[in-house]
Amino acid sequence: CVRNDIYNGTDIILPKYRGKIEFQKFLDKEEEINPKYFIKDDTLNVLESWDKMVKQFEIGEKISPTIMMNDAFKLYTELEFNSFPKWKQDYITKNKPLIQKYRPQFLEWYNNHLSILQKREIYGKLEWQTGAIKDNDSIFNHFIQIRQSGIRVKKGHYFPTLVAISQIPIYGKEKRYITPRECARLQSFPETFKLSPDDKKSYKQLGNSVNVHNVYTVISSTLKNYMVV
């Protein structure tokens, strides 16, 4: 139901931001970060392990789709293979050319890091979403998320979606999680906004929130279009 006395039928035009977003302005200085936010133990181990393999790829190599290392050297019967979900069949099939091309490197690397890659199913999966391998490329040049689907690596100049609690983005260059305060800045909350002392609650709230400036832009443009303000 539309009130014709308010809506005149014209499209709402939202303003477009033309400037360049400097990601660094959202971050605290590395020396000011609480040590608890720096990755360690299994998380650091598995990322450093994968980084050793990434550095063996040729410049220009395209890594797609998800590399599933714990399936790379297994031999499945036709019956076993056909029992897998379609997505898994596709990944295994599409992984084969890359695994074959770098087979000696993969074999040595996999055997050296077997314990961590098999410790959790997701540790054996790499989702490389940064395009072709570049000169001096590294997992730690980018953003990283430990997801249920695997270790996702995304370009360092786009911030990953904030997902409540379980998939806190890792800022690769500093090997640390993004802090709740930095998440709040990314969502355009003012510095005076009070965050919960419980990080889990803060990450959840910020992951479920919408950028403040975006909300303001939509509401103000809508009200102006309807000549309410």
Language model segments and positions:
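Flexible, glycine-/basic-rich loop-and-beta segments that form/coincide
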Residues: 1-54
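C-terminal target-recognition/interaction regions appended to catalytic cores
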Residues: 35-229
